[in-house]
C-alpha cells in the first residue's frame, strides 16, 4: 500500500485487532502483512506491534514466508506473525521459519488436498477471451523498462510469477505485473521469444494478462473459485483485487499444519 504505517486507516486496523484479542483472549493468533512492515519507520512500527501483543501476554514469532516455497509458482514474500499464550519449545524462534515449515510441507503436500503447480505454465489456459489480450496501442508502454525513477526490467513469460497485486487489473508495466505471449503458452514454455526478440518485436506478438481464474490459482484456490464469483455477479476488477489481496492458501495451510502436527 502507501506504507504510511499507523498514519492511515488501514494501519489503525491493527489496534482494532488488539481490542478483539483483549476481549476474546484467543490462545493463538496468526497475522499477515507485507515484508516491509518489519523495516517500516526504521523498525518502530513493527516494534509497536510486538509490544502491543506482548502486553497482552503473547509470545511473538515472525519470519518472511515466500509463496514459491509452498508449491505455488509465485514469488510472494509476506511477513507472518504468530503469537501464542501457550508454552512453546525453547528453540521455537528457530523452528518458526519459512525454510523449516516449507521443508515439512514438501514431504506431505501431495496428500493434503492442496493445489500445487511447478510453473505458471501449469495454470495458463490455451484459449481465453480476447479481452485479456493487450491492445496494440498499450503493448509498447507495458513492455518498456522502468523509468528513471523506477528502474526495473520488464520481462514477460515468467515461469515463476511476480507477486500478484490488488491493482493488477489496472495493468502496470511488465516489470510489476505478469504477461504472457501466446506462443509461450501454447509451447508450455519451450518457445520464449523474450530470449531472442527485441521489445519492438515482442510488441507485435499476441500477449495477454492473467485471467482472474489464473490469478486465484496462483494463490492456491481451486480453478472454479473465480468462475463462481463471476456467476454471482462479481466483476473482473473486483476478482483481480480479491486475488491480489488474498493470502496464499498453501502458505497458511503449511503453517497451520506444522503448528497442529507439532502440538504447538
Language-model features: locations:
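Class I S-adenosyl-L-methionine
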Residues: 1-171, 181-182, 186
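C-terminal target-recognition/interaction regions appended to catalytic cores
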Residues: 131-264
Amino acid at each position: 500500500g502507501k506504507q504510511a504505517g499507523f498514519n492511515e486507516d488501514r494501519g489503525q486496523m491493527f489496534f482494532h485487532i488488539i481490542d478483539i484479542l483483549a476481549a476474546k483472549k484467543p490462545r493463538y493468533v496468526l497475522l499477515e502483512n507485507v515484508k516491509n512492515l518489519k523495516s517500516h519507520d526504521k523498525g518502530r512500527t513493527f516494534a509497536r506491534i510486538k509490544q502491543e501483543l506482548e502486553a497482552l501476554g503473547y509470545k511473538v514469532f515472525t519470519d518472511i514466508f515466500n509463496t514459491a516455497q509452498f508449491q505455488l509458482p509465485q514469488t510472494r514474500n509476506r511477513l507472518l506473525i504468530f503469537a501464542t499464550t501457550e508454552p512453546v519449545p525453547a528453540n521455537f524462534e528457530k523452528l518458526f521459519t519459512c525454510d523449516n515449515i516449507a521443508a515439512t510441507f514438501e514431504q506431505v503436500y501431495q496428500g493434503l488436498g492442496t493445489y500445487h503447480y511447478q510453473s505458471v505454465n501449469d495454470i495458463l489456459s490455451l484459449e481465453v477471451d480476447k479481452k485479456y489480450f493487450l491492445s496494440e496501442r498499450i503493448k509498447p508502454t507495458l513492455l518498456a523498462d522502468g523509468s528513471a525513477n523506477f528502474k526495473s526490467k520488464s520481462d514477460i513469460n515468467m515461469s515463476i510469477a511476480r507477486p500478484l497485486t490488488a491493482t493488477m487489473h489496472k495493468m502496470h508495466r511488465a516489470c510489476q505485473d505478469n504477461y504472457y505471449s501466446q506462443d509461450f503458452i501454447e509451447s508450455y514454455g519451450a518457445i520464449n521469444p523474450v530470449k531472442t526478440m527485441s521489445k519492438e518485436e515482442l510488441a507485435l506478438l499476441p500477449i495477454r494478462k492473467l485471467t482472474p481464474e489464473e490469478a486465484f490459482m496462483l494463490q492456491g484456490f481451486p480453478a472454479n473459485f473465480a468462475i463462481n464469483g463471476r456467476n454471482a455477479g462479481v466483476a473482473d476488477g473486483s476478482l483481480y483485487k480479491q486475488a491480489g489481496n488474498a493470502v496464499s492458501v498453501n502458505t497458511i495451510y503449511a503453517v497451520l499444519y506444522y503448528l497442529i502436527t507439532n502440538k504447538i
